């Protein structure tokens, strides 16, 4: 179960100033997942306006952001067609509790850092502008505001504190401006709010993405903050017992519904994602509501279920007790030391969890689970609002009525309590509001039980100016599992509810200011040895914590920590004192407006779950909820009133707790917390004790603030990377043209009407696939895939490809343009680009807007990377240092060191699948890494795919101009020279290993892995299984459905002869095994909280593997491993059932249907369509996908299972245990270590992120 953190970063109530939630599809990667795809903290060409939260910033950064893939220890692309999309969980899962970020979901909409800046924009407060703004405001549709949510976070300053405003205007203009800015923002026109007589509130929002599905979430306003001293963790326990004990919820699983739950400080949420109807056209909403009613208000606290969940939670507690979790706890403990938030973490206390009986748990439920303390959200393809309201009343109307006592009369419909009990309900889409009548006999009823007026019910100590005597000294958390230095400086203030245009204007000005700071700091990656790894400033509202927190987070190598602090605070002070320049104001204001315009155009593409999350968080914070169009119009209305002086004044207030540190006028930091290692590696001396004191930290801050400062110079931003005259010369010289797509076909253009896919090939050998899609308005994505990847590294050049890709990204330059100029070009043109390396491929992916020639700008950038990339020694030094840090951090991670030891054993020590060692890194030169990367960029080894809302003429013009003029001709010869990876010969003494890690706390994990074929049926020992199976099928034709895929028109190829046979059947098998592992190892035996099965099916390399990841306790981990092995092998004796196969099909087909309108998903479908190294990928792999799933039989799935090597001689396992028993240290030698996901030892950005617990399924 996973907890949710509701941090809304500069959340602007639907205005799109806040980053849209990035959907993780409720798929949480546990530590055991060990997916080592790294999203680096050091971004390449990253222009960012995303300051909601540093962790959001990575989703949105424009520029060539390096999304680097290290050797993926387990997981390759999850899709059957190799698209790197986040998978949707296949079964219900209960995600509960701990300090996790509410950013757990993000929108899957393409999100750009907004771009081109209007030089003609004026920011003066002219009468025309004010009048124009007023018109914009009154044209916006309004709906009912709904009840005044009493659970919104407190926004009250302590007495005597007031906001300062200084506007130099004539009185008449000021009066007009004040009148406009003081008016309320509009409300979402389609959002319907209401309340039943028993107090349950409901919100209904029609939304057709995805079609024929809806989200139903029941939010109970109780969390860990409401627990007494002897109840720590009981809210989470109830969530587990109520959710997993519901029989009605279980019955929904056969309909294709998914369910989940989570617990946080301030609330517990149960949610169901469901089809709108069954196959028999029965309405599913009543059944879903009935299940939520049972879960929330009528759970069975059976002793057997309580014991099951007690074991699961204790396992979860150990599993999530990573060093990241412990760091997050430290941050929250110091940030909120004055209230219960510092000591009520949702996971609870082990000694208390072991003790509670059913009576104790039931009493907490009775105290807090009552109708007036719950809110129901329904968002989805709901057509009939009155019918939905009636269904809600039918299911929940009588709940709790008989149990409530006492009444207090209220006669005024305008009183606070009347507003609470008798909200308005908007029934028209145009926003006309009416009162929904309620039973008059119940209008006077007030309930004995009422939710807290403020959620969470805690009192904060705000960051106010004060004497240095009240300054808390920096706190230091030191631990042997930490690798790098990090420090967080916090400022805590009340939430400013965004209700008026003035509130929105302030948020806009903050975003502009912080955008400038982020860009400036990112430009400091110039020296060979930069003093910091990352510097992030986060200014965000938190509904879960009931406050707004500004956080400066600095991470660095331990040896550089003092310089890192000096640089960061110096830059903060410089921005605070001099402010942003006029050019920066113009650039970032216009960028934000363009981003807002883009999201407004995407209003019909926002998923139901993203809309629901946004509404829930906005209500918790007291923000006005608007739709994307309203938000954009409101933003336009206030943008014309923004001035440079005001932006700098508002921004300075955000930064003064750091910039004026030590002065009486400065707000006192809420906390300063440094998290540091106990020992560090020093060249020539080995491991040495790391010493640091609070005084040294304070001195470093003061030293940085005392350094002289200079104003920021204006940068010249290129309008084009390829001049028109240069382009014309290239076209004259190289004569770009299309040639026949293949030698067998004379046609130069192949268009498939059914899929809309067009295939082309350029004269320089580059194949191109494109698809015109209107699903994402004025948006496009493009991916260049280059074959080879790390597999092409020679035995004398290990690490050359992965370090080379990193070197290219570190430099960030093309042609004669500096890194800063390229970054700003990306901002101006709303380009987001990532560079990635895997075992098989190098890829560049671009997201762009079609507005203002954004696609042409993206193609210009791609052209420059191909033709004029710049390689520098200092960039290589930085890349080498990054991987050296990765390597040294492995022994400090239980999961990564355990996984690494297994991988080394299974793949016979092949370093291409692990991090490069220090000796390999030392051998690399700039020329060797450049050659390793760029030698793969030749025409017949590349493929470009584009999907977007463009025309045929637009896309083909860009293809010819910028790809056709690239000197990509040549043949990639390395394919024959690549040494194919192999599995270690078995049996081997390394097939069963253990790792022990010194730690203060006990934890355990294990991995089980073995060989599998690749996606197309090839194996490491040279067999072509597809050919074998197809021959057997033709000889032994028994008439099963798999032998002929009947569709409209002529029958298509049989499944067993189809190239995707293994892609389809292995996907189904994965779902089935995952379900069995959960049912057996987790639910029946109680040996783990988290267990999963994943397949890594390569496309180019002729092998694959599976891995089972399991977490447990040291006392149970061996039994858990044995149980997992039994499940893996049990499919022989306990065959697959029709019900299991049907559920797996439904899950995968639902995932396909949910993603099919996404540009990014189509980009994955197009991958390798013309790749010479993936010859079996053809159009049928896309066109037949649905029918292939439907046609698969149990026999087909069993054939796939036979190709998984699960026998004792083929299977590898490694068990990792951490604790204080140093004598048991059996960890792998450090020379073999490799790194995992993220900056190892560098803490994840954002409070509470790592403390999210894992799904139960």
UniProtKB/Swiss-Prot annotation:
Cofactor comment: Binds 1 zinc ion per subunit.
Active site annotation, chain numbering: 239, 309
Subcellular compartments: Plastid, Chloroplast stroma
A GO CC term assigned to this protein in UniProt: chloroplast stroma
Effect of residue 239 to Q: Abolishes endopeptidase activity without affecting transit peptide binding
Enzyme Commission number(s) from the entry: 3.4.24.-
Transit peptide: 1-142
InterPro entries named in the record: Metalloenz_LuxS/M16, Pept_M16_N, Peptidase_M16, Peptidase_M16_C
SUPFAM superfamilies: LuxS/MPP-like metallohydrolase
Cofactor(s), names only, from the UniProt record: Zn(2+)
Single GO term (MF): metalloendopeptidase activity
Keywords, sorted A to Z: Chloroplast, Hydrolase, Metal-binding, Metalloprotease, Plastid, Protease, Transit peptide, Zinc
One biological process term in Gene Ontology: protein processing
Annotated PANTHER family: NARDILYSIN, STROMAL PROCESSING PEPTIDASE, CHLOROPLASTIC
UniProt function note: Cleaves presequences (transit peptides) from chloroplastic protein precursors. Initially recognizes a precursor by binding to the C-terminus of its transit peptide and then removes the transit peptide in a single endoproteolytic step. In a next step, pursues the cleavage of transit peptide to a subfragment form.
Protein name: Stromal processing peptidase, chloroplastic
Organism (species): Pisum sativum (Garden pea)
């Amino acid at each position: 179960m996973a907890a949710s953190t509701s941090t809304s970063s500069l959340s602007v109530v639907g205005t799109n100033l806040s980053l849209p939630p990035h959907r993780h599809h409720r798929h949480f990667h546990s530590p055991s997942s060990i997916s080592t795809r790294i999203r680096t903290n050091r971004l390449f060409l990253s222009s960012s306006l995303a300051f909601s939260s540093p962790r959001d910033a990575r989703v949105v950064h424009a520029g060539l952001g390096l999304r680097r893939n290290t050797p993926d220890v387990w997981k390759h692309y999850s899709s059957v067609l190799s698209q790197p999309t986040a998978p949707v969980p296949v079964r219900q899962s209960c995600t509960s509790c701990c300090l996790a970020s509410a950013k757990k979901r993000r929108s899957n909409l393409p999100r750009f850092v907004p771009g081109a800046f209007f030089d003609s924009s004026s920011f003066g407060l002219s009468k025309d502008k004010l009048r124009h703004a007023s018109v914009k405001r009154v044209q916006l549709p309004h709906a009912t505001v709904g009840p005044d949510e009493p659970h919104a976070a407190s926004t009250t300053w302590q007495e005597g504190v007031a906001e300062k405003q200084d506007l130099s205007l004539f009185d008449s203009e000021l009066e007009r401006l004040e009148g406009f800015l003081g008016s309320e923002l509009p409300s979402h026109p389609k959002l319907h709010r209401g309340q039943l007589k028993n107090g349950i509130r409901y919100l209904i929002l029609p939304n057709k993405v995805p079609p024929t599905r809806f989200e139903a979430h029941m939010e109970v306003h109780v969390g860990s903050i409401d627990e007494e001293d002897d109840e720590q963790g009981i809210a989470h326990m109830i969530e587990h017992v109520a959710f997993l004990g519901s029989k009605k919820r279980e019955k929904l699983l056969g309909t294709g519904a998914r369910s989940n739950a989570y617990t946080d400080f301030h609330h517990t949420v149960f949610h169901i994602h469901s089809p709108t109807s069954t196959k028999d056209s029965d309405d599913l909403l009543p059944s879903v509501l009935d299940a939520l009613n049972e879960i929330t208000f009528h759970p069975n606290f059976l002793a057997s279920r309580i014991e099951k969940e007690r074991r699961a939670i204790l396992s979860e507690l150990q599993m999530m007790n990573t060093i990241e979790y412990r760091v997050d706890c430290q941050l929250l403990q110091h940030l909120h030391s004055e209230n219960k938030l510092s000591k009520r973490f949702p996971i609870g206390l082990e000694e208390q969890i072991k003790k509670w009986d059913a009576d104790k748990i039931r009493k907490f439920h009775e105290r807090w689970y009552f109708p007036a303390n719950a809110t129901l959200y329904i968002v989805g393809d709901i057509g009939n609002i009155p019918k939905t309201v009636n269904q809600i009343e039918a299911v929940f109307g009588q709940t709790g009525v008989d149990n409530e006592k006492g009444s207090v009369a209220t006669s005024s419909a305008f009183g606070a309590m009347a507003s609470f009990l008798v909200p308005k309900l908007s029934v028209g889409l145009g926003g006309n509001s009416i009162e929904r009548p309620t039973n008059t006999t119940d209008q006077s009823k007030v309930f004995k039980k009422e939710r807290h007026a403020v959620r969470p019910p805690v009192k904060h100590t705000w960051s106010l100016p004060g004497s240095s005597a009240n300054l808390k000294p920096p706190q230091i958390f030191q631990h042997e599992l930490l690798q790098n230095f990090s420090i967080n400086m916090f400022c805590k203030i009340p939430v400013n509810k965004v209700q008026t245009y003035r509130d929105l204007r302030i948020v806009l000005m903050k975003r502009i200011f912080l955008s400038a700071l982020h860009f400036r700091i990112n430009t400091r990656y110039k020296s060979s040895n930069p003093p910091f790894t990352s510097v992030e400033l986060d200014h965000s509202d938190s509904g879960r914590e009931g406050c707004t927190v500004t956080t400066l987070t600095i991470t660095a190598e331990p040896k550089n920590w003092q310089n890192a602090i000096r640089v960061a605070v110096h830059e903060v002070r410089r921005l605070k004192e001099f402010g942003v320049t006029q050019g920066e104001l113009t650039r970032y204001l216009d960028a934000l407006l363009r981003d807002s315009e883009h999201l407004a155009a995407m209003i019909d593409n926002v998923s139901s779950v993203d809309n629901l999350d946004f509404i829930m968080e906005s209500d918790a914070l007291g923000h006005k909820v608007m739709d994307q169009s309203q938000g954009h119009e409101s933003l336009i209305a206030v943008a014309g009133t923004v001035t440079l002086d005001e932006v700098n004044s508002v921004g300075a207030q955000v930064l003064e707790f750091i910039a004026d540190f030590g002065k009486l006028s400065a707000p006192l930091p809420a906390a300063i917390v440094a998290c540091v290692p106990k020992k560090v590696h020093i060249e020539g001396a080995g491991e040495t004790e790391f010493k640091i004191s609070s005084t040294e930290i304070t001195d470093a801050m003061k030293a940085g603030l005392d350094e002289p400062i200079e104003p920021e110079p204006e940068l010249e931003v290129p309008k084009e990377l390829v001049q028109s005259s240069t382009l014309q010369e290239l076209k004259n010289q190289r004569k770009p043209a299309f040639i026949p797509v293949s030698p067998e076909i004379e046609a130069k253009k192949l268009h498939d009407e059914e899929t809309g896919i067009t295939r082309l090939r350029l004269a320089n050998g580059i194949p191109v696939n494109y698809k015109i899609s209107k699903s994402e308005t004025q948006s496009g994505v493009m991916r260049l895939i280059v074959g080879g990847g790390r597999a092409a590294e020679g035995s004398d050049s290990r690490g050359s490809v992965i370090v080379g890709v990193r070197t290219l990204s570190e430099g960030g330059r093309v042609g004669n343009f500096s890194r800063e100029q390229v970054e700003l070009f990306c901002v101006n043109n709303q380009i987001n680009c990532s560079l990635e390396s895997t075992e098989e491929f190098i890829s560049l992916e671009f997201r762009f807007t079609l507005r203002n020639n954004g696609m042409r700008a993206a193609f210009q950038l791609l052209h420059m990377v191909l033709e004029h990339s710049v390689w520098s020694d200092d960039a290589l030094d930085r890349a080498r240092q990054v991987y050296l840090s990765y390597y040294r951090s492995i022994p400090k991670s239980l999961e990564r060191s355990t996984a690494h030891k297994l991988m080394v054993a299974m793949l016979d020590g092949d370093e291409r699948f692990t991090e490069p060692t220090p000796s390999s890194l030392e051998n690399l030169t700039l020329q060797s890494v450049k050659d390793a990367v760029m030698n793969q960029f030749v025409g017949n080894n590349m493929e470009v795919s584009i999907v977007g809302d463009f025309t045929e003429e637009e896309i083909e013009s860009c293809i010819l101009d910028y790809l056709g003029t690239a000197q990509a001709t040549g043949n990639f010869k390395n394919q024959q020279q690549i040494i194919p990876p192999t599995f270690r010969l078995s049996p081997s003494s390394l097939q069963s290993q253990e790792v022990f890690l010194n730690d203060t706390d006990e934890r355990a994990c294990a991995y089980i892995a073995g060989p599998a074929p690749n996606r197309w049926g090839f194996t490491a020992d040279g067999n072509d299984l597809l050919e074998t199976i197809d021959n057997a099928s033709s000889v032994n034709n028994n008439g099963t459905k798999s032998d002929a895929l009947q569709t409209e028109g002529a029958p298509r190829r049989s499944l067993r002869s189809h190239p995707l046979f293994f892609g389809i059947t292995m996907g189904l098998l994965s779902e089935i095994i995952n379900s069995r592992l959960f049912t057996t190892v987790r639910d029946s035996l109680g040996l783990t909280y988290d267990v999963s099965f994943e397949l890594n099916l390569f496309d180019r390399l002729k092998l694959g593997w599976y891995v089972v990841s399991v977490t447990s306790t040291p006392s149970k981990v061996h039994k858990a491993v044995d149980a997992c092995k039994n499940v893996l092998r049990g499919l022989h004796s306990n065959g697959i059932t029709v019900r299991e196969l049907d559920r797996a099909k439904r899950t995968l087909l639902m995932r396909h249907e949910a993603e099919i309108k996404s540009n990014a998903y189509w980009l994955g479908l197009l991958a390798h369509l013309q790749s010479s190294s993936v010859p079996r990928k053809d159009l049928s792999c896309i066109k037949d996908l649905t029918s292939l799933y439907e046609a698969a039989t149990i026999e087909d799935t069993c054939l796939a299972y036979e190709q998984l090597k699960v026998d004792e001689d083929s299977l590898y396992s490694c068990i990792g245990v951490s604790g204080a028993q140093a004598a048991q240290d059996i960890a792998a030698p450090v020379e073999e270590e490799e790194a995992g996901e993220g900056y190892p030892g560098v803490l994840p950005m954002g409070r509470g992120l790592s403390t999210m617990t894992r799904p139960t399924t």
